[in-house]
Curated annotation (Swiss-Prot):
GO terms under biological process: animal organ regeneration; branching involved in labyrinthine layer morphogenesis; cell differentiation; cell surface receptor signaling pathway via JAK-STAT; cellular response to interleukin-17; cellular response to leukemia inhibitory factor; cellular response to thyrotropin-releasing hormone; cellular response to type II interferon
Residue span, SOCS box domain: 177-224
Entry's Gene Ontology cellular component terms: cytoplasmic side of plasma membrane
SMART domains associated with the record: SH2 (SM00252), SOCS (SM00253), SOCS_box (SM00969)
Organism name: Rattus norvegicus (Rat)
Pfam families: SH2
Name of protein: Suppressor of cytokine signaling 3
Complex formation: Interacts with multiple activated proteins of the tyrosine kinase signaling pathway including IGF1 receptor, insulin receptor and JAK2. Binding to JAK2 is mediated through the KIR and SH2 domains to a phosphorylated tyrosine residue within the JAK2 JH1 domain. Binds specific activated tyrosine residues of the leptin, EPO, IL12, GSCF and gp130 receptors. Interaction with CSNK1E stabilize SOCS3 protein. Component of the probable ECS(SOCS3) E3 ubiquitin-protein ligase complex which contains CUL5, RNF7/RBX2, Elongin BC complex and SOCS3. Interacts with CUL5, RNF7, ELOB and ELOC.
Region (Disordered): 141-160
């Protein structure tokens, strides 16, 4: 078993401090998975590192529903937490890391497979609505920390199935909507350009046609958000 420390603050490029982290890694591969996730999160601009749940609530409470951030989890069993402002206040969803992938904590009674990803950014992007998708509106409900997927009921323009995810509590539900990350720092022009390019590279062939240095730069952060 390998134990490592809390991650450095967002936007900082120094190596990980390996003295204080309480969460235990199950393997070297899991350690590397998390290190890569932290590196990309630090470049994302919406990783708030060691802010607490209360601090996340204060940050998000003045923002519109759908605003979110990623922070270190205060639960020693998890590395990261997704904090999102909803129509019933701020919700904190634990991001599980197991089996070489990340996933949102889900209802254990659900029979549907939980979407899993090798990167926290890919997980966040999965739960963001595609362009042109409608916003969901439901009455407020009690806080909850579990997510379920509702199968697609109709298709978006272009034939893409529309999937909705809900946070459940006491038999009620509120929509999980991730529409805008809350920035923790000012992004560089290079990073903004990289996100734009990532959002328009819809095939591997397009990537291979780019010059080597540009491909390497894109590989370091391969998400459009």
């Amino acid at each position: 078993m390998v134990t490592h420390s809390k991650f450095p603050a967002a936007g900082m490029s120094r190596p990980l401090d390996t003295s204080l982290r309480l969460k235990t890694f199950s393997s070297k591969s899991e350690y590397q998975l998390v290190v890569n996730a932290v590196r990309k999160l630090q470049e994302s601009g919406f990783y708030w590192s060691a802010v607490t749940g209360g601090e996340a609530n204060l940050l998000l409470s003045a923002e519109p529903a759908g605003t979110f951030l990623i922070r270190d989890s205060s639960d020693q069993r998890h590395f990261f937490t997704l904090s999102v402002e909803t129509q019933s206040g701020t919700k904190n969803l634990r991001i599980q890391c197991e089996g070489g992938s990340f996933s949102l904590q889900s209802d254990p009674r659900s029979t549907q497979p939980v979407p899993r990803f090798d990167c926290v950014l890919k997980l966040v992007h999965h739960y963001m609505p595609p362009p042109g998708a409608p916003s969901f509106s439901l009455p407020p409900t009690e806080p909850s920390f579990e997510v379920q997927e509702q199968p697609p009921a109709q298709a978006l323009p272009g034939g893409t199935p529309k999937r909705a995810y809900y946070i459940y509590s006491g038999g009620e539900k509120i929509p999980l909507v991730l529409s805008r990350p809350l920035s923790s720092n000012v992004a560089t022009l290079q990073h903004l350009c990289r996100k734009t390019v990532n959002g328009h590279l819809d095939s591997y062939e397009k990537v291979t046609q780019l010059p080597g240095p540009i491909r390497e730069f894109l590989d370091q952060y391969d998400a459009p958000l």
